[in-house]
């Protein structure tokens, strides 16, 4: 799992994985920073003990994927995606991903800048080519 942990820690989205008893198996660095606890502090603990308002247990009980749930907590806006993990047709855990809006806004700004640059270059090419 070390390589997988390295991969998950490299992304800016928060990742949480729980087992069938809703005990935390893994959180990546982004999720750890968000909740203010390290993986070592939360591993093996009930998700609802660490995050009383967590919705992942509900998604697991219903066996439903829930995507793009907008939340605001501690002054941070984010979107949550929740996925039950199935083995042989049975829910055996869950994964939650958190996309922080500041990351999404940053990407949107970069896309806007690139679109402006492309429009400028298109205009210059038309001038040069007559």
Model-derived features: where do they sit?
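A short, aliphatic-rich beta-strand micro-motif
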Residues: 81-83
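Sensory-domain boundary capping and coupling elements
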Residues: 95-98
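Short, contiguous hydrophobic alpha-helices characteristic of membrane insertion segments
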Residues: 4, 50, 116-118
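Terminal output helix/cap of sensory domains in signal transduction proteins
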Residues: 35, 39-40, 46-79
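Sensory modules in modular signal-transduction proteins
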Residues: 1-34
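Glycine-rich acetyl-CoA-binding "A-motif" of GNAT/NAT acetyltransferases
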Residues: 91
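Flexible nucleotide-interacting loop at or near the entrance of a catalytic core
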Residues: 100-130
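Sensor-regulatory modules in signal-transduction proteins
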Residues: 85-87
């Amino acid at each position: 799992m070390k390589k997988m942990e390295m991969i998950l820690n490299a992304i800016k989205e928060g990742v949480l994985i729980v087992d069938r008893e809703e005990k935390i198996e893994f959180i990546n660095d982004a999720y750890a920073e968000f909740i203010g606890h390290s993986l070592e502090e939360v591993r093996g603990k009930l998700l609802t003990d660490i995050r009383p308002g967590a919705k992942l247990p509900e998604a697991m009980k219903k066996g439903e994927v829930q995507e793009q749930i907008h939340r605001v907590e501690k002054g941070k806006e984010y979107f949550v995606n929740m996925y039950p993990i199935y083995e042989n047709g049975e829910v055996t855990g869950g994964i939650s991903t958190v996309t922080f809006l500041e990351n999404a806004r940053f990407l949107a700004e970069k896309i806007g800048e690139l679109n402006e640059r492309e429009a400028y270059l298109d205009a210059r090419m038309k001038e040069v080519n007559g």
